[in-house]
């Protein structure tokens, strides 16, 4: 019989996280849950295909990077929402981190190039109907940065929890929304809407930042940090298209997509087209750099 006042420990629930390791006994493997990680690689080919393990590991690593990118993006969104100078400096710092991560993703795609196309074909059919289209974290990332496409929900029709995550991202303000709200509070012309006229006005409105950087130094840093991250994401997409074409040519994707022809349509996409377009509308440099009359 238990002593008066004592409580029996509750049985662990299925799926509950393991109890924390006592202080002072934490190991590297415990902290990083290495044993759990190593149990997650489960190739499906039978008999096993040697190269499938590489395929699984590379894509799992991408998903871990996507998780970190979402973590950083949510913090950046919060800082833009606050809008004070201290928060904007933190946003700039984190945006530079995001750009570094996105840059690191590019050579990782090249790891798959070490697999011969014929080797990939040895297990590719076993993946159907799984597809990169179903990477809900990548779709969340696109939404969080401003590329919102409700049609992507169709790829998660059989996964209600994942679909709900993407729905929340579709409804929440994106980084692009946050930037627009910030610029409007600071007196910039940033109309809402997707029309060409609204886009042109937004791009022209940013001229003030670049043509008078001494008056808008922090905003210029913010815009350039957003642009650099945007550029690295665009380069990642380009690397991805080349890798896919190198592996499967113009075949359709395992999930029924058009494969490379579809991916090529995404290459011109930008999260912040106005920052790119602002370059077109610049007419002079800062006053201190203007040539003598």
Show the residue positions of the predicted features.
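Surface-exposed peri-terminal alpha-helical interaction modules
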Residues: 2-293
